[in-house]
Amino acid sequence: MKTLFEEIKASIKNNYNQDRSFCRPVLPWGGVFTIKAGRKAVSCTPLYVEIRLKNTCTIDGFLMLLYVILNENENFPRELSLHFGREFVDCFLYLMDTYSFTTVKLLWIWDKMEKQQYKSEVHKASLIIDLFGNEHDNFTKNLENLMSTIQESYCSNWRCPTRVQEDQQRTININPPQEIPHGNLIRLAVNELFCSKIELCEEHGCGGLREFSQRIFCHGAPPFVVLNMQHWKSEDLAYVPYYLDLSDHKYLLEGATLFNKEEHHYSAAFQIGGHWMHYDGLRNVNLILLNKPPEFLLLSSLVYIRATEK
């Protein structure tokens, strides 16, 4: 039996433009997990208990991207195991390979999310878990210390009360430039966050110059990074760079997550073997080959993978 990833690659290879969609639903929105009571259960009524998942699009797109990234890069599962644990990575890949979509969502919810990050309630014989919210809260912030960075700064004024400072961040949030300059705005924003620089010290009454070191990854360059783009306007995103330099490492564009404002719904786009695909778990046909970017959707995040060192 072929794995899900092998089936997707085969469908791309055998595509002759007549049908640009994958043959079956992949990671559909929501999910129902049925628990059967054991034989020793005496007073369990009913014998079947359901776990119902709602509004799972806040993790679905990223789970799909994670699956593609781990399959496209043979060393990444081992690297990610250092952050997530080998048991989680192996279980995640097995569940996706075998089309166990509801179970893989429960794996993420129970293994990586805090209970206060989602709503749950018991209704009749069902436990309902509702993931309505922001995908960066439900996924990106739960990537352990994978993308943790640190930047040190020193003020030239010896009397500055905060002469030495450290800024540590667990996620990568880049903000649009306040003044719109010429050039690639995303790359400029990334450089603003990562590159060394000298600025006036903001400490009240200081007047010194503050020198910022290059921002570095706390645990080495991660296999992939997620750039939070939810504060950017569409007009600022006319050009998306296909590669970025982050802390002396080159990263290549692998995918993105997208937001439908009218439906308050997330989807994802990613590439496999040079072919771009759009995944939307809410649709009946939810995985299609792209011949142009999806329309009327806002960019929520950009996902880059670390380039292979040659």
From Swiss-Prot:
Q: What is one GO biological process annotated to this record? A: gene expression
Superkingdom of source = Eukaryota
Q: Which InterPro entries match?
A: C14orf28-like
Function, in words: Could be a regulator of the dopamine receptor signaling pathway.
The UniProt subunit note reads as follows: Interacts with DRD1.
| Protein name (record) | Dopamine receptor-interacting protein 1
Which species expresses this protein natively?
A: Homo sapiens (Human)
Q: What is the lineage of its organism?
A: Eukaryota, Metazoa, Chordata, Craniata, Vertebrata
Which gene is annotated as encoding this protein in its UniProt record? DORIP1
